Amino acid sequence: MSSEIKIVNVVVSTKIGDDIDLEYVADVLDNSEYEPEQFPGLVCRLSDPKVALLIFRSGKLNCTGAKSKEDAVIAINKVMEYLREAGLDLIDTPEVKVQNMVATAELGMEPNLDDLSTLERTEYEPEQFPGLVYRMESPKVVLLVFGSGKVVITGLKNKEDAYIALEKIKNTVKELEEEYF
């Protein structure tokens, strides 16, 4: 039985041009904020797809909040088209790279976090945070495992690694249960 993995955030980066005039962009781009004394980039929020784009003077752009790489690319293309219409000279086809994906899933069981905390690469301080932090080496991701069986997986580069990580943590939990009972 395959568990459902839900991608809840995708962060991508790209370069859209060189030496972007952020003051000008802030004037012509709706739903944008540029306050260089607080943050060096311009923040633009879109509602469809619902994302935030961070545009920097260097031409670097980060897109966060997307539910897929495809949604992030759609958002980037929308903003680039608008900026081209406003007179900016931008890269024709920017290379979009996934920096991080966050997924949620269910273990289908309630793990004993005290038992799990005996494993290497784990941190569990229930007085500080209710979840156990497990730093998996392969795939190289971080899992937040909760006593309810809910799991948050961060540091993903693709959805396939989420399935691999979930299967590994499920097997680890089952092995520990057998060992302790």
From Swiss-Prot:
GO biological process: DNA-templated transcription initiation
Family per similarity comment: Belongs to the TBP family.
Organism: Methanococcus aeolicus (strain ATCC BAA-1280 / DSM 17508 / OCM 812 / Nankai-3)
Protein name: TATA-box-binding protein
Keyword Ligase carried by entry: no
Entry-linked InterPro entries: TBP (IPR000814), TBP_archaea (IPR033711), TBP_CS (IPR030491), TBP_dom_sf (IPR012295)
Keyword match DNA-binding: yes
Signal peptide: none
GO molecular function terms noted in the UniProt entry: DNA binding; DNA-binding transcription factor activity
Pfam families: TBP
Domain of life: Archaea
